[in-house]
Amino acid sequence: MDIVKNEICKLLTKRTVLILLFLLVLNPVLGLYTMNTVNDDGYTGKDYSALYGEISNYSREDVLPEIEQRQMTAEAYGRISLCSRVYKEALACLSYDEYLDSVNEKADEISIMNKFSGNGGFAEKNAAKTSRVYSKLEGTVPEVMDASGLLNITDNELTDYVAVIMLFIIALNLVFYEKSENQLALLRTTARGRRQLMASKSFVMIMAVILITLLLYGINAVISMCFYNPINLKSPLQSVYLYYGSPFKLSIGQFLACYFPVKIISFILLGMFFMLICAALDNIIFVFVASAVTVVIEAICYTTISGTSFLAFLKYINIMYGVRTGRLFSDYVNINMFGYPLNTGVLYGLFWLVCIAVCIFAVTNYLNSVHEKRLLLLPGFACGKNTGCHTSLFLHECYKALVPGKVLLILIVAAIFVVWWNPAEKLSYDSVDEVYYKEYMDKYYGPLTAKTNELLDLSLIHISEPTRHSLISY
């Protein structure tokens, strides 16, 4: 226990605490900014929540006509887009029984097609299994409700990536800095080497994961309570449009009770993986590069690979699939495992059990024995690759340029900010006509040539006289 206390004290250095506090404050600031920023459809997250608050007093029979009436009387493009989105979500909730019927009908169609073709393969098994799973949801009645507060907690991509950065910083302080200062050399002479120390570091990482999760997502929960409509924890999970296709018969409260343990487990796996990288590599530049490349590759596999691709296992056997935990509950996907439909949630669970066991074992046992290179003594002379102290001048210069002045950390933060901040021009429109005008002008943008004149004349033939006059004057 004393070793654990010492590790916690060594982790809470001034530099580490300041960086973690900065990230902790940055998360809600960017979240509030995003909530009040007009998106590409012309409305803010606050407008979306406000519209749900306005229609919450209407009955199930009156809510769709009310939204349709608001859409017809709206003049601004953003208001029209907002009403269209809310109408689509409300219609989906009110027609949930039809959605369940369509799942069963699709299963029957696939079964009939496979019987005629004589192929009782994966498609038929998958359809039958999907139908059985969704049949348990019969009788579920989703409510038309504002899900912004819940999604701000469970599907906030910015918070997920801030948590990943915080885990990396903690792993770096737990493992790499002591190792780089050669403070662990004497432990190799003890009976248990560094195994007990690394086990304590692993325990501290688990504690840090739980604390980070409670702080980051707890702050998001406070923001949701202050700025969004209240969340009805007794409503079915399918009331949230993003979880409309969920196969789980859970209330929102039960969903949250399952969500956070899965999130914590996924973060533990990622933290252990960062610790393993720090234990295996001796150069801080290699640690940064290896960690960044790993996260980028995982994110690319998760976001770009289709669920129907033969590489789908790379999408679902993926740390980012667990970090973005909501997908484990919102989708029901089976992949072809030797002709048998295996659910991706089960697959990820098996993947987690194997990987976290391997990472904990590797972290606690790596470098338990001496790994220094030895000289090979031959008659008359000694030959060895590491006969003396050797430093790569290139890596030394990289270290001087990036690490002492925190330049590398600043560059990483700047890169994340650039990715988050879309530099593209954000346009807002007051009417649908302005959208048409903008598309028209973009289409014929450029010097006025004979070919452009010909295209303009052809397009004006199909336009009425008032509209033609408006375009010419515009």
Set out the residue ranges of the language-model regions:
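Helix-loop-helix units of permease transmembrane domains in multi-pass membrane transporters
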Residues: 3-7, 12, 172-210, 393-397, ...
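Aromatic- and glycine-rich beta-strand/loop motifs that create alpha-glucan
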Residues: 1-20, 373-411
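Residue-level detector of conserved catalytic or cofactor/ligand-binding positions
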Residues: 461-474
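Secretory targeting signals
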Residues: 23-69, 107-110, 114, 122-178, ...
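Terminal transmembrane helical anchor/hairpin motif
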Residues: 38-43, 147, 230-254, 285-380, ...
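Membrane-helix interface segments
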Residues: 16, 193-194, 283-288
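Extracytoplasmic loops/domains of multi-pass membrane proteins
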Residues: 66-110
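Residue-level recognition of pore/gate-forming positions within transmembrane alpha-helices
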Residues: 24-28, 204-205, 292-296, 414-418
